[in-house]
């Protein structure tokens, strides 16, 4: 059985030397980071070499959040994303922030409209076409709203899987799938051919995170270290192995009681103990 490799996303320590942080994360047992080094000080080639010498890989890069149609029409931005992807030897980049998750930046229940979703989908298709000409794919990072919001009885997630160019892959966040009221293991089986990467996230409450508003820190709760919440983490890791995924990317939007390094250590050990992560 081929095991998953552990990676992380976020867990930034802005007041610390990033290289010392990366070295410590590698020492825990992590092999990669979802995010790139593009904006770091220093020479990009040397930075990447240093990162790789720590035994770490750049797993993914973000392309755009927001208006897809505007992004698709900006040839300079498209070229920059392609350059970045090629530099890190990535076959896909990530997008997020369509209208259905508007509640995170406004108020609970503000999930856009059907027409706004169709606008988003049109833009996504345009981006996929332009990136595809250069051999770069597009991944979409989900939250819970794609599963709770429906139009004419069809969930937003099903619209994304059927109305968007089938080259679209999911950067599937299993925790948010669960918050959306869907069994993440069952959904992974359903969408197994459309999953590009896995974000492994745990929650101790299913309802509270739905009311998150970015501008209100008191609402950023419900997240917890892997294995201490209610998401079937072991089942998700097992299914990840079964469907041929390479990475288990740990994400926790807000710390609960642990420091970032304590959390990453505990999460890694929980995944390794499952037997599905090396």
Regions found by a protein language model. Give the residues of each.
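Hydrophobic faces of well-ordered beta-strands that scaffold small-molecule active sites
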Residues: 4-9, 33-35, 58-63, 93-95, ...
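Acidic-and-aromatic substrate-binding clefts and catalytic sites of carbohydrate-active enzymes
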Residues: 10-17, 32-47, 65-76, 101-104, ...
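Conserved, mostly hydrophobic/aromatic
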Residues: 25, 33, 51, 85, ...
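Active-site acidic/histidine proton-transfer and metal-coordination neighborhood
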Residues: 39, 71-169, 261-262
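Alpha-helix-loop-beta-strand connector modules within alpha/beta enzyme cores
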Residues: 50-64, 124-127, 131, 158-164, ...
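Acidic/histidine-rich catalytic cores of soluble enzymes
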Residues: 133-230
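A short, acidic, amphipathic alpha-helical segment used as a generic capping/interface helix at domain edges
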Residues: 228-241
């Amino acid at each position: 059985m081929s095991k998953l490799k552990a990676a992380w996303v976020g867990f930034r320590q802005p007041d610390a030397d990033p290289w010392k942080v990366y070295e410590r994360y590698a020492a825990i047992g992590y092999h990669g980071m979802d995010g790139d080094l593009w904006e770091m000080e220093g020479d990009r080639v040397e930075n990447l070499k240093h990162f790789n010498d720590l035994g770490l890989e750049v797993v993914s890069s973000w392309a755009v959040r927001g208006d897809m149609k505007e992004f698709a029409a900006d040839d300079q931005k498209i070229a920059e994303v392609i350059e970045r992807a090629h530099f890190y030897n990535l076959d896909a980049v990530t997008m997020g922030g369509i209208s259905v998750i508007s509640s995170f930046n406004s108020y609970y229940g503000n999930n856009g409209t059907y027409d706004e979703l169709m606008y988003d989908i049109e833009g996504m298709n345009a981006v996929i076409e332009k990136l595809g000409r250069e051999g770069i794919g597009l991944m979409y990072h989900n939250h819970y709203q794609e599963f709770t919001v429906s139009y004419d009885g069809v969930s937003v997630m099903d619209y994304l899987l059927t109305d968007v160019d089938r080259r679209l892959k999911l950067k599937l966040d299993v925790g948010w799938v669960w918050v959306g009221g869907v069994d993440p293991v069952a959904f992974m089986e359903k969408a197994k051919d459309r999953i590009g990467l896995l974000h492994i996230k745990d929650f101790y409450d299913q309802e509270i995170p739905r009311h998150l508003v970015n501008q209100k820190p008191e609402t950023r709760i419900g997240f917890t270290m892997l294995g201490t919440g209610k998401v079937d983490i072991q089942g998700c890791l097992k299914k990840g192995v079964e469907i041929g995924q390479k990475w288990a990317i740990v994400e926790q939007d807000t710390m609960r009681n642990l420091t970032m390094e304590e959390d990453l250590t505990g999460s890694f050990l929980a995944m390794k103990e499952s037997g599905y992560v090396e």
